[in-house]
Amino acid sequence: HLAALGALAGDGLLVPVETSVKGVEALVGVMEAAQEYREALEQVDPRVPRSFVRLFIPTKFDARTLGDNRVLEKIAGLEDLAPVASPIAYRPGPHRRATERAVPLQLVGDRQAREEVERLTEEFLQRVVAQDAAREGVLEEVAE
């Protein structure tokens, strides 16, 4: 219940999707939950976006494998529901160290890992936050 309350308190979900068959299969449950969150929010605010998912983030991506590339193509097909970020590469060492130390990846990762986090942040700002600002501007104009 805590996850649901947290989601409802926010503006939507950033959904990490592992670039594996299991990752795509897990999306079914995530999308069902996101729809429930959206319906609950719609009762309070009818201006809720069509999708409660704000950004799909492909994770654990290994560009060298055919399987990961195929799954990434499937994830890209979700663009109609929400923007899809560039994939986050599979880096077991830095990710494990960050988890073990309970610190952000930027503190234990290499330059490439830090650049990926910066790129993801920039994509979020451009594709989600800017879109929200534009939509809010349109809604404010309609209200006037």
Predicted regions and their residues:
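Inter-motif core of Ras-like GTPase G domains
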Residues: A3-V21
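Short glycine-/polar-rich loops that comprise or flank the Walker A/P-loop
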Residues: A9-G12, P49-R54, D80-A82
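Beta-strand-loop-alpha "switch" segments that mediate conformational coupling across diverse proteins
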Residues: S51, K60-V103
